[in-house]
Amino acid sequence: MGTLSVNQNKLQKRIRRLAGEAITDFNMIEDGDKVMVCLSGGKDSYTMLDVLLYLQKVAPIKFEIVAVNMDQKQPGFPEHVLPAYLESIGVAYHIIEKDTYSVVKEKIPEGKTTCSLCSRLRRGTLYTYADEIGATKMALGHHRDDILETFFLNMFYGGTLKAMPPKLLSDDGRNVVIRPLAYCAEADIEAYSQLKEFPIIPCNLCGSQENLQRQVVKEMLQEWERKSPGRVEIMFRALQNVHPSQLADRNLFDFKSLKIDDSATPRFLDVMSL
């Protein structure tokens, strides 16, 4: 890649800055960490690896990076692409070979979305492998738009207010998951991926099918952003500005104990005495 244009340089700086801010805000990476970067071959994970390699050079702390890809034995998967790329940039890597493709095809009826089961099988395998290699952090490539889409998916279809946290402790307490791109917009990542000419590998398991519910939410957010530029960022900031007393979850706020405080100073004027 040659000299960057002004806009390309701004894009690179923005992604690096936002990733650095997310890592700092949530204390994602600490001195001495071994970060397992989960590399799928998509634009998000390539961008995450690229940014982490840069931050590794300039950060005031020392941490190790190891890239891990899971070969799920999908027909036509170009298994040479990732090793060739990682060797070309000098990054240590592991390829996990596990035939989850056959499991998914066996369990999911023809025509149904395979994303959910595929994701669970992959996540479980990666958790186990991170433990085996002594990784202290497991980095995933989810970005701001993924997090917000998940929030609306859970609200619309699951009746719960939750998203993807930038930092997560696994249920068994053995893995810490981090999402360094949590503050980055998908459009920026797409542009950065094209700029860097990453060797993208499409998902052939399902013919690159979209999860239909997620696609509906994605299109909704895109339409909102088109009509009101900046709305997506405002909504994302709302996830960091939660007021439990203004919601209705009795587990988060003790509504039953609310009582009038007779000793409190009145906030309003006595209009009848004016």
UniProtKB/Swiss-Prot annotation:
Chain positions of motif PP-loop motif: 40-45
Provide a GO biological process annotation: tRNA thio-modification
Residues bound to [4Fe-4S] cluster: C115, C118, C206
Quaternary structure and partners: Homodimer.
PANTHER family, per database record: AMINOTRAN_5 DOMAIN-CONTAINING PROTEIN, SULFURTRANSFERASE-RELATED
Q: Name one GO cellular component term.
A: cytoplasm
Q: Which organism is it from?
A: Ectopseudomonas mendocina (strain ymp) (Pseudomonas mendocina)
Q: Which protein are we looking at?
A: tRNA-cytidine(32) 2-sulfurtransferase
Record-listed E.C. numbers: 2.8.1.-
